Amino acid sequence: MGPYADGVTDTRRPATLRLLFASSHPGPTVTVTVLAAVIAAAVGHPFWLVGLVALAVVAGQLSIGLANDWIDADRDRAVGRSDKPVARGLIAVGTVRTAAFVTAAVAVVLSALLGPVAAVAHVVLVAAGWAYDAGLKRTLWSVVPFVVAFGLLPVVAVSADGSAIGAGGGGGTSWPAWWAIATGAVFGVAIHCTNVLPDLLDDAATGVRGFPHRLGLRGAGTTAFAALVVAAFLVLGGQVLGDDPVRGLGVVLAVVGTVVVVALAAVGVRLVFAGRASRTLFRLVIASSLVLVVELGLAGARLVA
């Protein structure tokens, strides 16, 4: 951009990009993208396909996060959400809305390059996120988009074959193991319940009565961390059972990972029953997710049905 008439350089573009990124829910966006990339790499996809999976997923997650802040702009302003650039008036709602649609379009285009099964799975995943933003978050069914989206994430990562650009291996589409899909689904429950805990009062004041709100602080918190434990044991079972179980050090690492997740869940439940619905709970879920990501990476080809 050129200088203004008074000689001041226009620095709005970098600032706008930073504010858009801050409006995209970067923590969950990065976590989901890393999870998809790790699964894609673990099942043996070539580097370029892992990168394509990551690009498609990050575009979809950016669109979901941006749509959330655009649609919730008035509500966030009403409750004084200082962590939301739109609520603080630092960026226009229209700018965030446009970015949400653009990134959604990019996600659809990139998804189409992954191959038919992965493409359909990812478009449904992104649509589930938008459905949550658009109104499901206010209903008892608010947990459904999370179950669908996280359950489909392994399908996107494992089934991607690049056949849409003539790069498929010709061996047919791979499908994730049932336990990988189940792990994603129950992990989605944990993410949803924990993410809304710090906002229960603000949400109640603005008419949001989703699944976690109806459970209350203790009910939602306990459900979240119980789901994490279930996810950990699903991953453990997927590694030590079946036709090709891990052995030796692999068993040790699998068990240690499960123990770590259970310990983090215990800390989380203790905080919940102490009435501390802080962002610390969400950080515990993110930490648990990183442990599960490592375990999924170690599972390798066992992720494929």
Where are these regions (language model features)?
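Multi-pass alpha-helical membrane architecture of UbiA-family
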Residues: M1-A305
